Amino acid sequence: MTSGSTSAAVAADQLPGLAMSSPDEAARAARAVLSGAATPVDETYALQALGIVQRERGEVGRALRSVRRGIRVGREHGLGARVTDLEASLGTVLALAGRRRPAFAAFDSALDGAEPAERARVLVRRAAVCFFFQDLDGARRDSHEAAAVLERHDDPAWEARARSNLAGALLGLGRFAEADREFARAQELIESTGERYQATIIVQNRGDCAHRMGDLPRALRLLYDARRRYDELGVVPPEVVRDLAVVQLAAGLTEDAAGTADELVAVLDGARDSALRRSDGFIAAAIVHLAAGNPSRAADLARKAARSSRRQGHDDAERHARVVVLRAQAEAGAVTKRHARAAAALAAELTDRYASERLDALVLAGRLASATGLQELAGEALRTAAAGRRGRGSALRRATGWYAQALLAESAGDRRAMLRACGRGLDVLDTHALSLGATELRARATVHGSDLAALATRRVAVDGTARELLRWTERWRGTLHSLPWPAARHDAELAAELGRLRAVGSLIGSHADEAERRRIEERIRRHVHGRETAGPRTTRRRLDVGELLDALGDRTLVSIVGLRGGRFHAVVARGGRLKHVVAGDSGAALDEVEYAKFALRGAAVAADAVAGVLLAAAEPGLARLQETMLGPVVRELGDGPVVLVPPSTMQSVPWGALPALRDRDVTVAPSATAWLRARTSTPPPDRSVALIAGADLASSGAEVGVLAGVYTDATVLTGDDATADAALAALDGSWLAHIGAHGRYRGDNPMFSSLELADGPLTVFDIERLQSPPYRLLLTACESGVGSPTGADELLGLTTSLSALGTAGLLATVVPVSDAASVDLSLVVHERLRTGDDLGAALLAARRAAAGARDRATAWSFLALGGA
């Protein structure tokens, strides 16, 4: 290399490598070489780099001209090694142009007479082209040979590329464990060279491998790491954004995935990538938007992908895009015989590279054919889908196979086989959920079982017994409470980040705080999402109906389920018997709930006269809400306490405000299984009490002060002493705890719902650090009982995590309430708890003791949750 023939920062022989990590810089430097007095060898490097940049931007014609010009220069000056290298580059460009035969001819020419090390570097690139054309065995052979030669020649950079290609081929062949080992070795090699860009590519590939192995926490951790590395390098390839969106979707993080998909579309619209890369990216974004409930956006993106693929002759990619268009159209209501036949035809045409997409197409064809009377086509499509995927592939693919089996059985009128297939599919998803160490992921992952659960529940609601309906409702409800809780462990990194979050939260008035808070929250979520399960794997706790009926005693349990586009169905368990009752229209409930909460919110903080007017105006709406949710169930309630198990979307109903429930002992539970666990749990032998007053709560001093006089041995934290760490220490293992603090419900991010303490917010993530949760906990914070519905029928929030951790009884509110009124209520509740009442009975006493309208509104806004 001659000085002066390159830019001041880059030598000519470094330009081809720079073309991948910094294409703009490489292009500028290459043009500077070509416009100056370059030596022939430097000219070949510059032309090769320019060709790589043009290739990656999708400018295939220009790339071919640049590389061929480099070959001519090399031949004219007898630069044999450079010609070999450039012919390999030519083969890669020709492959991207879809010209398979000329591409392999270029590689044959490059290999002819090449020295061993040169030959190995050519084989690395030919392996990549073999992979591109789905010749996985060819890619494996070339990569294996190249890796062995390059190891002998002590060339770690190229050996890393060879092993990365080998891993990709093994991944495509389904040999995941071998692929993972090769990727790990490739990363080790490339890290030793200091090539940060290539190292980042391998981290990304390891994330894709982990995803295919079904290890979503590890996949998220690796892809988040890859994205961070790319950001530091200032280069964000669309592939990493695509992979992250796909894995976020698989993890149930639909909103996150939709945001990532929008970023992907923006990257693709602003980039000049190859048609295939653009097509793959647009398809991924379309699938995410389809899952996020935006079929119109999904269809537009999929059509864009289809056009791009068609122009370049990428048939499989075009077929895949057309499948997504059909799925989006079906979601939007286009259910016709033409659509069914089109889906079946596309499924038949997709190659093995698109096996997962073929499964989706088969299930779609089966559903559409069944709905439009094409029973023979439906049976054929569903049989193929069920046979191919029930026992292999990722958990989500296996569950889809069982869904196909269930649809097949339903179309054949085999009720028993249909329910069995639904159960097997949900079993697969339980195992999948157990692999996730983050509770948020466990809750959100249940969305993948929604179709299975809905299919079975709809059927038993029509022709099943009350016992069947209860069992199937419990089968997919309250998963966080039915699966073993991830073992608590010390996590220094998480603790430090939560401390930083509190520090930022306490800096009131700083304009920079909000952006910093968002950054810290994102780091926390990414860290927790990458957490893997610690400890032995066990199974889901199943409901024992006999045990439930025995435990109820004189109580009545009402399990409510809302069917899509239908009515609320309830199973009433009382006196050792079960009864199925049909209530009101499920579509009418949400508006009534919001109106009821609006009225209570106003009345709970108003003067008594105004509160009375607001409550009187709310009465007709509360009566309508009762009729919608319960209807004839009211006549089945008996005289004893009532346990309500509503859908997650109805957990925040102010149940104590409903006319038939105001004068009853009422508790609410996320599932019958959760209530039974709470009811039969053993209180701690050490009856320790924790009393905690939060920050900036004018009435909390009086409340906690009075309670401290009642519980003379309690741990009392007020003022600056009420820090997060001190509160957690006091809560851990306590028999009874009371926190009077302002609460903040985060609908945008429920795991950051919090209680305001002296040093900042105590979040759900903090609560999950408890080794042993309090047996009973009273939360007088505003909206402390509100959670975010997610997944199939789950809630995320403060009370959900506490009850899933093992807290047997909780008192919380569903709307903001008056601090002063909640103090009076708290004192009544504590008085009754000390006499031996459970929380439901204690809250009933508080409702009865409420003298004025504002006090009644406050009492109606509280829920007793759990079973103690």
Regions found by a protein language model. Name each.
Residues 2, 415-663, 682-690:
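Amphipathic alpha-helical protein-protein interaction segments
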Residues 6, 42, 82, 118, ...:
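Structural signature of alpha-solenoid helical repeat junctions
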Residues 579-581, 588-599, 643-736, 755:
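Catalytic-core domains of enzymes
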Residues 660-675, 744-808, 825:
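Cysteine protease catalytic core and zymogen-processing segment of caspase-like enzymes
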